[in-house]
């Protein structure tokens, strides 16, 4: 495998042929998925690797991931069906944000993978407007608590309702308003909004959010906590005793992804130090696993989490662009990248599984724990970050939030 850094090849663990085979498998599956879904979105979690239609329509953050995969396939293979479907999927979200019918605390990862390629390939005015509206939506509906470190208030039922009087699906903002580690990702959409409008208010808000997330969601050991509220750090699940198992891996993954993207854009020494603090904690606590567990210190037989593995791999591949190849930090991150890519390839769909009759399936196994105990489910977000990792490895790819 070879990684690419500004057209410079970086030695890895396997050859290009293995990665291209995996990438072509993704293309085959996505083409078949297009036959079924066309301009509709699937549920985030598959059941036995099979996706079903989204009961909540578009009120879900993984919509950006689904659309983003189509954009990456178009960029890699220049096949127009991928572009046409991506454009049609984008329009549905543009209409929602224009009518202010979508309020989401993960709005950054929702809109960036769909809007930015639309701007890049089509110079879309609608995409620019949607990005700014999404940033405004985040600031007015979701960011008040994370900008104010002393705020302990949550939205009321009345405020949670959208203009049509309906509650926002599973996006219960009262539950999610506590400072989330994933708000690091929302800073990116604020930076984009300032780039488009020239209005300093967006990055000013982003700076406040960054300060509070670093202060409240990451402890001195480097462990990241999914949420912070009412003066307490806590994780996003009651399924496991996370205190006894080193914490919640997904929170650690989101911390690394947000910090890596912010560092390549800000060059902040503080962000640099926090990234390595979080990375070192994960490496030590996970004991060098090729596929991370749902709990950071999980042992063999516990739930795998290939989605978090893919997010961490993409974080490494983003951060490593800023490091000199001879540095110890570069070598440490590359060692982790090799291990995680090896693990993801083992979780990926195999060519012999790609029969003509198998539509609507995901790409990687063990992407979600699922409360009912399904250990082999795929998720849209896990699939997206797996595709992004392959894209970063095979192409001199410019991320859609650059």
Regions found by a protein language model. Name each.
Residues 1-402:
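Glycan-recognition and catalytic cores of secretory/periplasmic carbohydrate-active enzymes
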């Amino acid at each position: 495998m070879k990684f690419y850094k500004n057209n410079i090849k970086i030695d890895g663990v396997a050859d290009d042929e293995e990665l291209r085979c995996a990438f072509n498998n993704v293309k085959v599956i996505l083409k078949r998925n297009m036959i079924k879904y066309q301009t509709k979105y699937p549920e985030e979690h598959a059941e036995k690797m099979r996706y079903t239609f989204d009961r909540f329509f578009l009120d879900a953050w993984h919509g950006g991931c689904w659309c983003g995969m189509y954009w990456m396939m178009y960029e890699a293979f220049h096949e127009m069906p991928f572009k046409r479907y991506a454009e049609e999927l984008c329009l549905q979200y543009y209409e929602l944000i224009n009518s202010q019918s979508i309020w989401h605390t993960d709005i950054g990862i929702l809109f960036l993978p769909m809007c930015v390629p639309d701007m890049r390939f089509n110079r879309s005015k609608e995409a620019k407007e949607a990005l700014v509206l999404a940033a405004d939506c985040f600031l007015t509906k979701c960011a008040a608590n994370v900008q104010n470190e002393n705020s302990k208030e949550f939205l009321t039922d009345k405020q949670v309702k959208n203009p049509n009087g309906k509650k926002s699906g599973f996006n219960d903002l009262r539950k999610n308003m506590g400072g989330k580690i994933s708000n690091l990702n929302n800073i990116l959409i604020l930076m984009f909004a300032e780039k488009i409008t020239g209005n300093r208010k967006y990055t000013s808000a982003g700076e406040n959010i960054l300060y509070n997330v670093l202060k409240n969601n990451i402890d001195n050991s480097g462990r990241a906590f999914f949420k912070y509220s009412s003066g307490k750090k806590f994780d996003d699940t009651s399924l496991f005793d996370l205190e006894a198992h080193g914490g919640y891996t997904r929170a650690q993954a989101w911390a690394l992804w947000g910090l890596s993207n912010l560092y390549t854009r800000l060059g902040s020494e503080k962000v640099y130090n926090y990234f390595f603090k979080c990375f070192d904690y994960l490496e030590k606590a996970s004991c060098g696993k090729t596929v991370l567990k749902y709990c950071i210190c999980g042992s063999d037989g516990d739930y795998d989490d290939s989605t978090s593995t893919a997010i961490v791999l993409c974080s490494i591949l983003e951060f490593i662009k800023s490091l000199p190849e001879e540095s110890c930090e570069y070598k440490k991150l590359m060692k982790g990248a090799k291990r995680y890519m090896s693990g993801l390839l083992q979780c990926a769909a195999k060519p012999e599984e790609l029969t003509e009759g198998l539509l609507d399936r995901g790409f990687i196994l063990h992407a979600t724990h699922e409360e009912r105990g399904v250990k082999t489910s795929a998720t849209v977000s896990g699939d997206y970050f797996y595709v992004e990792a392959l894209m970063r490895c095979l192409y001199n790819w410019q991320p859609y939030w650059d």
